[in-house]
Amino acid sequence: MAIQHPDIQPAVNHSVQVAIAGAGPVGLMMANYLGQMGIDVLVVEKLDKLIDYPRAIGIDDEALRTMQSVGLVDDVLPHTTPWHAMRFLTPKGRCFADIQPMTDEFGWPRRNAFIQPQVDAVMLEGVSRFPNVRCLFSRELEAFSQQDDEVTLHLKTAEGQREIVKAQWLVACDGGASFVRRTLNVPFEGKTAPNQWIVVDIANDPLSTPHIYLCCDPVRPYVSAALPHAVRRFEFMVMPGETEEQLREPQNMRKLLSKVLPNPDNVELIRQRVYTHNARLAQRFRIDRVLLAGDAAHIMPVWQGQGYNSGMRDAFNLAWKLALVIQGKARDALLDTYQQERRDHAKAMIDLSVTAGNVLAPPKRWQGTLRDGVSWLLNYLPPVKRYFLEMRFKPMPQYYGGALMREGEAKHSPVGKMFIQPKVTLENGDVTLLDNAIGANFAVIGWGCNPLWGMSDEQIQQWRALGTRFIQVVPEVQIHTAQDNHDGVLRVGDTQGRLRSWFAQHNASLVVMRPDRFVAATAIPQTLGKTLNKLASVMTLTRPDADVSVEKVA
């Protein structure tokens, strides 16, 4: 299935605010977010079209929330299978670890299968909404140089024509073999797994059982995954001495599939590819006016499906900060918080993915025996079993420093964590997810109180200039009490009672939420003004030049 790029007339000497190297998922998400912020963006891709073979197969709740932030989630959902469980099986087929979280604190199912090329196509189509975003395919980045106030890119087209791009910033989303990262001599430390895996995708799923199974077979570990649109993926470890060419031969492919299918001859093969699993992390994510994101910054084994999702976290974290800097609303020191916040969590996800791979295919035979023995204990330790079932082992992003203002003990503070996204009731009676009411920018959310009460006129002006939405949350039965309305404040009803529980748990009545839905600060009305001043300083926010009109929200 070839996904052709839009018919774009080539031009020479492009001048933009942001150049993005790579039209993969991270580059396209960056382009969509920056596009809706009004930033002038150019995406350059060396291939002539999007990659059309499946790679990632797992998209989580945080990534779907990111899709929601750019208005694409409704187009993405048809290419997903929600509530997709992951089950580890012993060689005899006994399930010893069942990862099946049923929580939706961020508004979406926590684990989902998906077809990456179709979702990438949604994002490519998404950028066409913005006249300020252009995508140029068949453009190889041959060289680039940094100046004090810009980056110069030298491109070559498929016909050999040279083009020059001038950009204020360059975001490298050009994959694990990133030309940008290598040119800058940024160390990419880590390991490459000794064994490769062959991935086989089959149409008209011959099994059609739901979920994904990781079979810990000591002879040849394998994976069986149900994907949307009746696609079945099998992954088999390539054993020492085997080559991709050998495994592609019909008799050898038949032998592989006979492990998992009663009739390996009656299948509709889509493709087979051999992959090497790497675990590597760039030493730096920002080098002056160049920023690394996605696989250019970190790569990890596939076993927890977090490579794609980590890239989405990068895009969401970086895009809003870059937009503020370009718009003159923050100084470029804000961009230093991108590495400060994202690098440690990316490392944690790499470590988790490596551990999951070692459970599936232990490096030593005795480790597999130990795994099988320990797995029996899970049946007799319900708390431990729930720990896996509810996916509590997944390191949730929590930032201890960066673009946030924390006071008190970090361990129990909600600051630096993603804010929940329950359903809320609007004053017209509509019920929607919280982010839909907030929009794409900052929000100051108050439980029961007028969030403007503790702010000075100057502070209101400063935060309105950022597009901040001021939200008053009330019990749903109070949503139509007109006397509680305040100019410039959106009132929402707590449809599910989750917001009341959140504020009660964290002993706060106000939360400052960043555009990437992370909690930047908490306060009570009497401390909000002081907290916002400290937060503005930490984020290096600038003062608005002109008054911002007060919005009346009905």
Swiss-Prot record:
Entry's Gene Ontology BP terms: 3-(3-hydroxy)phenylpropionate catabolic process; 3-phenylpropionate catabolic process
A GO molecular-function descriptor: 3-(3-hydroxyphenyl)propionate hydroxylase activity
The enzyme's E.C. designation: 1.14.13.127
Binding site for FAD: 17-46, 285-295
Functional pathway: Aromatic compound metabolism; 3-phenylpropanoate degradation
EC category: oxidoreductase
Keyword Disulfide bond: no
Pfam families assigned: FAD_binding_3 (PF01494)
Cofactor(s) named in the record: FAD
InterPro entries referenced in this protein's UniProt entry, alphabetically: 3-HPP/3HCI_hydroxylase, FAD-bd, FAD/NAD-bd_sf, PheA/TfdB_FAD_monoxygenase
Keyword NAD in annotation: yes
Catalytic activity: 3-(3-hydroxyphenyl)propanoate + NADH + O2 + H(+) = 3-(2,3-dihydroxyphenyl)propanoate + NAD(+) + H2O; (2E)-3-(3-hydroxyphenyl)prop-2-enoate + NADH + O2 + H(+) = (2E)-3-(2,3-dihydroxyphenyl)prop-2-enoate + NAD(+) + H2O
Family: Belongs to the PheA/TfdB FAD monooxygenase family.
Protein name in the entry: 3-(3-hydroxy-phenyl)propionate/3-hydroxycinnamic acid hydroxylase
